[in-house]
């Protein structure tokens, strides 16, 4: 045997084979035909059952027999895929009208697998037979099956618009389809209106076909999405569960779910809601129970007393499949090609199919009627000369000779002669002669009617309308899905998402933040906080998990962090660096942190920079829904840094202290409220090469503690400060020395909450009690606390 070797490139071979494969799965596997709404395997299953007489009026047959018939004659693929397709056609939570009735376990809405095919039994549903009706009247084209042993239909007659009624879903190479189920009566009514007016608009069609009608019911939101889908084939709607509220004997309420969105797995939904409860993602749910039984679907969500049930419901809509979005993608095979189709195109394609089906059926019936008429006319003629016919037949040698004699002597046709010789003697009575004459009249009327249908397009359309109306009357059902015009915005109260709990918030100067339970904090004490070497506590306070933390940095930016999003870490352990929560720059430093319970307040923030700029912005401006990146708090110019952020409930005095020992005190009422992107105004009139080291709020009972680079601490009382106007030079707080003058490196307002100070050099730190520092007069340089020869030059001071 000679070999033929072809020299082909791998790219060409792969491209050609994948192209063939793609065409096959698009046309022969995954996408439905627009005319009957069926994929090939579904069509083959229904036809195999019909051909074998497995119809609704007969007994159920083993599913395995049907699967075997389908595989053996039409669909040479795995038995499991055929059985899965067969089972889906029987599932009333998948199809709006099932096409197969099945006895036994055919799966469940919990996605349980069906029983094996050897255990289940099935037969066609009554409605499925409407898809196959008249298939034996040459209504559709047949093609050879895969092994040329029999024929199979290319499409079913489909006496109702099955694609819209039962919808379809599938994925193929480069294409996917998602067509939702609809109400049969509405679809037929819309089709009837389209027949009456082919120019009908989508808006007008939507008076009859309201939107999808899912077998699982539910509430559909978004008329605009439905309209868009019906116009273009693509659109989006919201499908939410039907949820009712019940009150129990103990006064508690429970949410009862009786309908869920289409194709949502009920058991997965119950599991997800229970996980939200167990993980404390939502506060207020006591228990989740699946109470579904043979009477219908029922999920009970028992709530705590006095909880806001509406907020719980909204949270579940947002965070579980209690509400989903459904995306229309109405792709179907039309004229052998996949097409994205609007509802008018789908109805038009279906109508053209029905015109062809009814025309073919009418031609078939007309041909049979004319053939029968020809036979009846021959029989009537024969009966009118009965004695001569009998004599001729008796004188003939055999049946064949009798037929030839009848044709030759009395001019009967071959068909008439065959009917005459086959006539039984009892048919020669007067009754049968009358019956033949009656049949002749009926055939005349039928032929006239059939010819009228073929010759008159309107008459043909009327036949389609009559048959559609019959199906509508016989199979109509109430709409299951409620349609709401607008998509409801889901608003979730923070109290529902986050259990209210008092915790300790801490922030270190190096930017490590955490929340700690009060029990862990009380078991340790402030001084036992987990810190890295060289780090210290910037701030700690009691907050609520429903509060928000604002973290301000030297770049004039702030981080918006809900407290409940902070890691819950023990007091003795190291916190989480803010950069792990919200990304910040490498040289960005945390300067202060504040807690906000409610942004709807008259409070305000004051921002002060090293170069003497200041501004005031109200707290509500800082509320945001973006948590993932730093936000602008104030504009900080190049070569400047934000050094102070203060929060005040009302206007009060602030004191500004500079490196060269100048001090200016004035009221925040001199500052106008500005937006977040403003740079502010001049706070103090700085000398050359001077800069601000402190801007803080001050009151009459406070003192001010200052540290100089030479290791000196100076403490002054409020009375030394002179209240003035903003942007002035201020007063001098240091005695100027010609050689190695003192320069203030840090200063803080000391209130009753402060008792200790800590001085820092590059390599050392010194602790002491603030009360050990005596108050000084205005023009002094304070008292030396450390020897800079040993300690090093002081670079900073903190108080606590």
Curated annotation (Swiss-Prot):
Keywords: Cell membrane, DNA-binding, Isomerase, Membrane, Topoisomerase
Record protein name field: DNA topoisomerase 4 subunit A
Catalytic activity of the protein: ATP-dependent breakage, passage and rejoining of double-stranded DNA
GO molecular function annotation: ATP binding; DNA binding; DNA negative supercoiling activity
Quaternary assembly: Heterotetramer composed of ParC and ParE.
Cellular compartments annotated: Cell membrane
Annotated PANTHER family: DNA GYRASE/TOPOISOMERASE SUBUNIT A (PTHR43493), DNA TOPOISOMERASE 4 SUBUNIT A (PTHR43493:SF9)
Gene3D superfamilies hit by this protein: 3.30.1360.40, DNA gyrase/topoisomerase IV, subunit A, C-terminal, Topoisomerase II, domain 5, Topoisomerase, domain 3
InterPro entries cross-referenced by the UniProt entry: GyrA/parC_rep, Gyrase/topoIV_suA_C, Topo_IIA-like_dom_sf, Topo_IIA_A/C_ab, Topo_IIA_A_a_sf, Topo_IIA_dom_A, TopoIV_A_Gpos, Type_II_DNA_Topoisomerases
Chief localisation class: membrane
Membrane topology: Peripheral membrane protein
PROSITE patterns assigned to the protein according to its UniProt record, in alphabetical order: TOPO_IIA
Organism of derivation: Staphylococcus aureus (strain MW2)
Similarity field: Belongs to the type II topoisomerase GyrA/ParC subunit family. ParC type 2 subfamily.
Site, Interaction with DNA: residue positions: 39, 75, 77, 88, 94
Residues of the site described as Transition state stabilizer: 118
Active site (UniProt): 119 (o-(5'-phospho-dna)-tyrosine intermediate)
